[in-house]
Amino acid sequence: PGEISIDDIESITVLQGPAAAALFGPDGSNGAIVLTGKRARRSYSNNQWRSYKLKDMEEMDYMEVIKIAEDDELWKIYKLLEKSQARLAGFYFDMADYFHERKQTRQAFDILFNGIELCRGNANGLKAAAFMFEKWKCFREAIDIYKDICEKNPRDLGSLRNLALAYFQHGEYQLSVNTYYEIIKSNESDIYMHDEEYRVIAINEMNAVISQFKEQLNIGLINPNLVRTLPVDLNISVESNSYNFSDLRIAGPQGNQLTTDNKYIPVTYYKSRHYWYYDNFISGHSIRNAAKGLYKLKINAYDYYYYQVPVYLRVIIFRKFQQCNQVLEVQHIAMDNQYGNVEVATFRW
């Protein structure tokens, strides 16, 4: 009892001065050595299939350390933690997000760019960064990333859809509609895997923008047969910068699963499904007449290997979809190394 095996140690961190005192009080005044054991973490590899809630997973140890730091010690403690995490892009993404949460915007950008460099130009890493910028409401930066991806991969209709959504969130409604229409018009010869599904998503979301801001838009060049609305209470889509997901399920307030057999209906114009595009996952559902209460989003996650690129889910919820009073809600969820049937998000109607 009390013995420590080297095989049970995940990392060793040496803390000095304020960082050690912040964790251990007077006992840490002369410094401290922190041994991180191998245990279940939000971002620790696991290959045992199970059902669980993401919110119940413990945070990484470095997040527990940084969260007790005072503002004037934040950067110093970050630099100490970096010594044992410098090769992990996910560390920089986590730290950047927390610095932004603490209103340390300049440092957050600097840290995030370090994480982007570790992704080595990988398109999925760039999408992870764009998701982070969206979360921070820095839509211009997200737009620039999506435009760069689309220039390098013109057939990547998934990134074009991301660009259209970013324009919409930034209030550039005409550019949003134009981009959606570009997806819809994409040449038949450019079909790659599930391009047709992305065209259908583009029709849905283009009409959502038009239904809300028609008076501000020039839609004269759009085929009028494509301008139509089928309003629903909720339109939900979940996508990732990774492909290791399947089987999105939505549990209603009474615990009933969203299927085509009950009062819920599949997303307008296409059946409920999940599909992959350029190594990314996306899935969606619509609910025509939503019952009041709590909804739970569950998904099968297979990301049990450690990758250099951080893995995120982005949950897009349109309330009063394709109606003049519709509201867009977006959730960004870190999903590194999750494996199992995971409840990733909840929302109320």
Regions picked out by a protein language model, each given a short descriptive name:
Residues 54-56, 85-92, 119-126, 155-160, ...:
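Generic helix N-cap/helix-start motif at coil->alpha-helix transitions
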Residues 98-99, 133, 167, 210:
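Residue at a conserved register position within TPR or TPR-like alpha-solenoid repeats
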Residues 151, 168, 172-192, 203-210:
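TPR/TPR-like (Sel1-like) alpha-helical repeat modules
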